[in-house]
Amino acid sequence: MANQLILLKKDFFTDEQQAVTVADRYPQDVFAEHTHEFCELVMVWRGNGLHVLNERPYRITRGDLFYIRAEDKHSYTSVNDLVLQNIIYCPERLKLNVNWQAMIPGFQGAQWHPHWRLGSMGMNQARQVINQLEHESNGRDPLANEMAELLFGQLVMTLKRHRYATDDLPATSRETLLDKLITALANSLECPFALDAFCQQEQCSERVLRQQFRAQTGMTINQYLRQVRICHAQYLLQHSPLMISEISMQCGFEDSNYFSVVFTRETGMTPSQWRHLSNQSD
């Protein structure tokens, strides 16, 4: 694409030897589609927004983790108090003898799965390492770059240890109710979600959980689930031959007319218009 925005190394790294640095987004504003001359890890701490990665939309909130390659196209829209950090790195500058391909999905041709989640325990450990990494990447002493790379190695190992698929929180996990709730919502794309049953199972207060969820994500539970379902519908409309009525069922809407109303309200166009526009841009 002739007018594609490309973020350049020289605008983020202090010199050609620096391999890793941290870019804070407190908050992350709307950002047009772009690629990079470097790779990045994206950690979401709070709030919510729409992250479109290689034309696939993701409704993101606390705990979302992305592995972004240099050539990937992504953008941020519909942001609401979205707080995240980008840990950016140049693969060719890394000198540490670490099996990076085993730690970082998509690293120099490794199998790529971009979207993961971290529970509260993993987030806390990652935040501690990122704070140290940010301090070193801003340092000027002779060993700052080496220390930053060591910490980057520690970070990617920490992320590998604690990350999990968005709909697959391990049964043995000691994560918080909020983490369990977000995983349960990810497993409810096709079927109704009963918050009262979830709270009964977890022996928690429904009112308190609703308050905690809104405080951390900036959305109600129903708003988040609706947004996740609409994002899934957008993906299916673009990448599957399913009929709109079939897509509505796969996204938890038993009535395709109601699905069309909600989809239009959230995206500004009907499902048919979205599919037509997406096919034109392919």
From Swiss-Prot:
GO MF annotations for this entry?
Answer: DNA-binding transcription factor activity; sequence-specific DNA binding
Q: Which GO terms describe its biological process?
A: positive regulation of DNA-templated transcription; rhamnose metabolic process
According to UniProt, where does the site described as Interaction with sigma-70 lie? 246
Organism superkingdom: Bacteria
Which cell locations does it reside in?
Cytoplasm
At which residues is the DNA-binding region annotated?
Answer: 196-217, 244-267
Going by the UniProt record, its keywords in alphabetical order are: Activator, Cytoplasm, DNA-binding, Repeat, Rhamnose metabolism, Transcription, Transcription regulation
For this protein, the record's InterPro entries field holds: AraC-bd (IPR003313), Homeodomain-like_sf (IPR009057), HTH_AraC (IPR018060), HTH_AraC-typ_CS (IPR018062), RhaR_RhaS-like_N (IPR047220), RmlC-like_jellyroll (IPR014710), RmlC_Cupin_sf (IPR011051), Tscrpt_act_RhaR (IPR023699)
* GO cellular component labels: cytoplasm
Q: Which residues form the HTH araC/xylS-type domain?
A: 179-277
One matching Pfam family is: HTH_18
> What's the chief localization of this chain?
cytoplasm
What function does this protein fulfil?
Activates expression of the rhaSR operon in response to L-rhamnose.
Its quaternary organisation is: Binds DNA as a dimer.
Q: What is this protein identified as?
A: HTH-type transcriptional activator RhaR
What organism does the UniProt record list as the source? Salmonella typhimurium (strain LT2 / SGSC1412 / ATCC 700720)
